[in-house]
UniProtKB/Swiss-Prot annotation:
It comes from Clostridium pasteurianum. GO terms for cellular component: cytoplasm. Keywords: ATP-binding, Cytoplasm, Glycolysis, Kinase, Nucleotide-binding, Transferase. Belongs to the phosphoglycerate kinase family. Monomer. It catalyses: (2R)-3-phosphoglycerate + ATP = (2R)-3-phospho-glyceroyl phosphate + ADP. On the 2D-gel the determined pI of this protein is: 5.6, its MW is: 56.2 kDa. It is found in: Cytoplasm. This is Putative phosphoglycerate kinase. GO terms for biological process: glycolytic process. Pathway: Carbohydrate degradation; glycolysis; pyruvate from D-glyceraldehyde 3-phosphate: step 2/5. Its EC number is 2.7.2.3. Signal peptide: none annotated.
Amino acid sequence: XYNLLTIEDIDVKGKRVLVR
């Protein structure tokens, strides 16, 4: 997922990124 209200671990082009 992707949720702007939560910190979620998403896979972008094979890289693990932290989205806040």
